[in-house]
Amino acid sequence: MQEIRGVVFDLYGTLCDVHSVAQLCGQYFPERGTEISLMWRQKQLEYSWLRSLMGQYVSFPQATEDALVFVCNALNLKLREDTRIALCNEYLNIKPYREVRSALESLRSGAVPLAILSNGSAHSIQSVVGNAGIEHFFSHLISADEVSVSKPSPAAYELAEKRLKVVRSKLLFVSSNAWDASGARHFGFQVCWVNRSRNTFEQLGERPDHVISGLDELPNLLNFASADR
């Protein structure tokens, strides 16, 4: 592995499980929770990308809300205002994956900065990591809102390079989203793809430098594991 001077994480789906919202979805719409969550996430991503391409950028929370409205319309589900608010707020409480805290603790011993680069708004990022109890691990929380364009735009990835003041080739970008890993590799980051579900990597002209099945493998990959492990 080349020299690493900083590690930058995606948030949604990498550190925290977006489909933890399925439980609350199922409370409001019995037996439809997983279906809603899967469709909601896909449409959320599509809207964030399409808005960027159209030059009509909206914040990730707005794209999330718009996506939920679409899903309920498509599934012929009546979405009350209080339900919409509750479900969108649940995106601020998505749960960290089980290995996240221990992995971050080990990585912190490596004495390189850890950062998050997300399409989420600054408020959303702060809320998610705060509610998950992992905010203290990160020196920078970076939102694509700052450039009004979503990942995988190079302009979004450039934010991390500028904020950490580290040349892109010496930053490791970690994401479970193959489209994100492709975009980051195209930008010039070293990339680690977290393939928890044994998915097939996207055919977008780029390949990750490393593939792991969970973040618990990352400390050993970087040789930053704490002495007591």
UniProtKB/Swiss-Prot annotation:
UniProt keyword terms in alphabetical order: Hydrolase
Family to which the UniProt record says this protein belongs: Belongs to the HAD-like hydrolase superfamily. S-2-haloalkanoic acid dehalogenase family.
UniProt-annotated site: Important for catalytic activity, residues: 14, 151, 157
Active site positions, chain numbering: 10 (nucleophile)
Name by which UniProt lists this protein: (S)-2-haloacid dehalogenase 2
Superkingdom assignment: Bacteria
Catalysed conversion reaction: an (S)-2-haloacid + H2O = a (2R)-2-hydroxycarboxylate + a halide anion + H(+); (S)-2-chloropropanoate + H2O = (R)-lactate + chloride + H(+)
Positions with a binding annotation for an (S)-2-haloacid: 11-12, 41, 118-119
Ranges where the record places region Important for catalytic activity: 175-180
Native source species: Pseudomonas sp. (strain CBS-3)
Enzyme Commission number: 3.8.1.2
GO molecular function ontology, one term from the record: (S)-2-haloacid dehalogenase activity
